[in-house]
């Protein structure tokens, strides 16, 4: 308020100065000479008198202007002192201030992998509906397969998306026993080309990969914007995924949509990676089955991904190389989060490895151990959170099936598992399917 008042005083001083000079000039030109009244005839009869009058007026004006210059100098001096005191900007005002310590949002493209599904419209409609900024989240649709109907759907979005096309549509030479897997080879080829475009051609620092049959949650962009700095800062992480492999509605805590975990299993299905990771993977990218290849120890290198309690993507694509089998048995039951969580306003430091391992392991092994049958029949409800212990590959698979969680293992790692532990909801309470506390690593022979 004081600054506004001071600025107002300076402005009024300048206005008074200009107005005062205008009045003075008007006064000097219209006032009579000292001692007599002027008349047109007198001035016209005596040119010398006219000259003297003009000179006299000029002298008076000069004296008054000199006095006014002094006044103006005083105003300038007072303004200078006031500006130093209040640090008034002399340039255009700065941009709207950010919260201290909040970096500008990074540019993270959404790479949509498309082929021959014209239903890509459903995927793109949701992405565009929830996208908070076209500048920070450009959408790039990479199309394989040469399917014209799908191409027309993508083109209908105009400049809202960027449409690129994988140029090599030829069949891939494979061994006779792999001919039925031709689709998996083409998918791997497409991923390699599309990710190469994102990181090698467009030079983006990161990207979120989304398949054309995924629908995203309202806070999909918020989730990745918040976890991107964590992924950059923590070398023990190598991806952030929107997917929970055990995310069926009855197996998640719907009251905690903000809950995030570390997982040793690569989930895919809407995942964020950095350019540095692509530089590491591209030279050895596989010919086929790229996602299972990502789950091998030589690629994972002990690193983890972030995954949510409630998935931020949902697949609606029954059509695909797996012929709908996995979709019917599992994928279509995954719950999509509908409650917006302001992740960028939350403290996610609990996901850093040292803090997470300490707190998560204390939580799991601090929970009372209960036999799987007692969990199934909901005995000992008073215990609340419990732990079911397995000691072998076979006992893991048996207990997982009994409790309804995914029982397959990739290089020894269970889906959604971290340090061998799979955590989920069962009949309203938290259950941890866990190895003994002495666990010291995965056995790749557990497949």
From Swiss-Prot:
Keyword Protein biosynthesis carried by entry: no
Pfam families: GNT-I
Locations listed in the record: Golgi apparatus membrane; Cytoplasm, Perinuclear region
EC number assigned by the record: 2.4.1.101
Highest taxon, organism lineage: Eukaryota
Catalytic activity: N(4)-(alpha-D-Man-(1->3)-[alpha-D-Man-(1->3)-[alpha-D-Man-(1->6)]-alpha-D-Man-(1->6)]-beta-D-Man-(1->4)-beta-D-GlcNAc-(1->4)-beta-D-GlcNAc)-L-asparaginyl-[protein] (N-glucan mannose isomer 5A1,2) + UDP-N-acetyl-alpha-D-glucosamine = N(4)-{beta-D-GlcNAc-(1->2)-alpha-D-Man-(1->3)-[alpha-D-Man-(1->3)-[alpha-D-Man-(1->6)]-alpha-D-Man-(1->6)]-beta-D-Man-(1->4)-beta-D-GlcNAc-(1->4)-beta-D-GlcNAc}-L-asparaginyl-[protein] + UDP + H(+)
Cofactor note: The cofactor is mostly bound to the substrate.
Cytoplasmic topological domain: 1-6
Residues bound to Mn(2+): 213
GO CC annotation, single: Golgi apparatus
Record: active site: 291 (proton acceptor)
Tissues expressed in: Appears to be present in all tissues.
Keywords: Cytoplasm, Disulfide bond, Glycosyltransferase, Golgi apparatus, Manganese, Membrane, Metal-binding, Signal-anchor, Transferase, Transmembrane, Transmembrane helix
Chain segments annotated as transmembrane: 7-29
Record: residues binding substrate: 117, 144, 190, 212, 322
Disulphides: 115-145, 239-305
UniProt-listed GO biological process terms: in utero embryonic development; protein N-linked glycosylation; protein N-linked glycosylation via asparagine; UDP-N-acetylglucosamine catabolic process
Subunit and partners: Interacts with MGAT4D. Interacts with BRI3.
Family, per entry: Belongs to the glycosyltransferase 13 family.
Function text: Initiates complex N-linked carbohydrate formation. Essential for the conversion of high-mannose to hybrid and complex N-glycans.
Protein name: Alpha-1,3-mannosyl-glycoprotein 2-beta-N-acetylglucosaminyltransferase
The organism of origin for this protein: Rattus norvegicus
Organism placement in taxonomy: Eukaryota, Metazoa, Chordata, Craniata, Vertebrata
Gene symbol of the encoding locus: Mgat1
